[in-house]
Amino acid sequence: MVKIGVLGLQGAVREHVKSVEASGAEAVVVKRIEQLEEIDGLILPGGESTTMRRLIDKYDFMEPLRTFAKSGKPMFGTCAGMILLAKTLIGYDEAHIGAMDITVERNAFGRQKDSFEAALSIKGVGEDFVGVFIRAPYVVDVADDVEVLSTHGDRMVAVKQGPFLAASFHPELTDDHRVTAYFVEMVKEAKMKKVV
């Protein structure tokens, strides 16, 4: 069984743990840097990206997270987690983890009161996934090797690049665990490649 960490500094941690377990993997809430060595994949949960960055800096997680990304182990960022994974953020001089060749606009769908749900078609997942968007970012631009898995209107809301997956929406806030299960499969495949 693969072990998937959920960065436990801030955000929808419990909901991700429940979704990982429902997808047949072991979930570990990561609150200490050394726990990164014990896991096969990592989820960066949605929350408030500025607060999350402050906590990542406070607990010296940034370099270990960048090292984890360089190791080739899969990472999945939802909402604020997508912002953390992006190489370019509109209106900001530097990236956070910067593992994905994507450009992201923060709070692009509006403020908290503009939050909404939308039916999405997600490549490799299904036609009828309900995406929960809360002050959501979206992907403005992608490198050639980034696969766009889903759009809402003309906006890219789910993307994949190598071992990295990012979504504007919160798949953990529904009882539909297919997006998490998709990530669990990515982690299983990556672990098998390391064994071979």
From Swiss-Prot:
**Cellular component per GO, a single term:** glutaminase complex
The keyword Lyase is assigned to this record:
yes
Provide the species name.
Answer: Bacillus anthracis
Please name the NCBIfam families in this protein's record.
PLP_synth_Pdx2
Q: What protein does this entry describe?
A: Pyridoxal 5'-phosphate synthase subunit PdxT
- Superkingdom assignment: Bacteria
Active-site feature positions = 79, 170, 172
* Residues that bind L-glutamine: 47-49, 106, 134-135
